[in-house]
Amino acid sequence: MFLMNMLCLIIPILLAMAFLTLVERKILGYMQLRKGPNIVGPYGLLQPIADAIKLFIKEPLRPLTSSKLMFTLAPMLAFSLALSMWIPMPMPHPLIHLNLGVLFILALSSLAVYSILWSGWASNSKYALIGALRAVAQTISYEVTLAIILLSTMMMNGSFTLSTLTTTQEHMWLIFPLWPLAMMWFISTLAETNRAPFDLTEGESELVSGFNVEYAAGPFALFFMAEYTNIIMMKALTTTLFLGALHNPLLPELFTANFVTKTLALTMAFLWIRASYPRFRYDQLMHLLWKSFLPLTLALCMLHVSLPTVSAGIPPHM
């Protein structure tokens, strides 16, 4: 039974990830006044399946000088971590009810750094190593702000359990009282998932394609799948944290439809940003975090910690 539950979680995620690649190519196409994929199947709907078949039947090449074990393990670790992050997500019921679901997600997203580092180091290529070091520095840096924003949000929630956020946001979405945090969270998730305009790790003019430059076929597909699964996961987490889900006692069936609609809208905003903005310079990226986001999030976190203490003695009618 537990295996069935796992499959019922993993298969829709993989389907969503496959069609997200098509949605991205369509959005980029229409924003550049062209059609995007429209040959394979009606309106190009079978394009992700064709891409998957092409990637998985190719021969996975491995550089002669690379470290065999790490080179093979890195993409597998990346993809398994990307799928594991979905375990505590309430949609509307999580796979496992974790008391500290938020910390679990944070810990796994920190572990994902190792897969990037291993792939860059094991490839034995200077481009891959520089790309990996950039990605690791960027991911670790933005983890700090993500953790502080999560801490402030959990102050409003009262616990680290994601399922209780639905009850917290019955009357009002948390995006309204926490809008500065929500904006910084959105930008930090862009940096966390290495997406434009923060895709410094794969600056084509400098690093060919970043840490996965030596990968081909199946292992490359695993990295690609991990990236897109992470994007959907981050947007699903954003929906849970800030946009609440529709909590209608008369129509509880609408929960999932509502959740999916909001997640899709946020994911399309991600893709829209990719089509609209140029890439940042690396020092600007770090300055944005350490000189702007970190002081702001720390100040707001202190505010959210002190407000309940300060207002504890005020009578309710005031």
UniProtKB/Swiss-Prot annotation:
GO terms for molecular function: NADH dehydrogenase (ubiquinone) activity. It is found in: Mitochondrion inner membrane. One of its GO terms (biological process) is aerobic respiration. It comes from the Eukaryota. It catalyses: a ubiquinone + NADH + 5 H(+)(in) = a ubiquinol + NAD(+) + 4 H(+)(out). Belongs to the complex I subunit 1 family. This is NADH-ubiquinone oxidoreductase chain 1. It comes from Tolypeutes matacus. The lineage of its organism: Eukaryota, Metazoa, Chordata, Craniata, Vertebrata. The gene is MT-ND1.
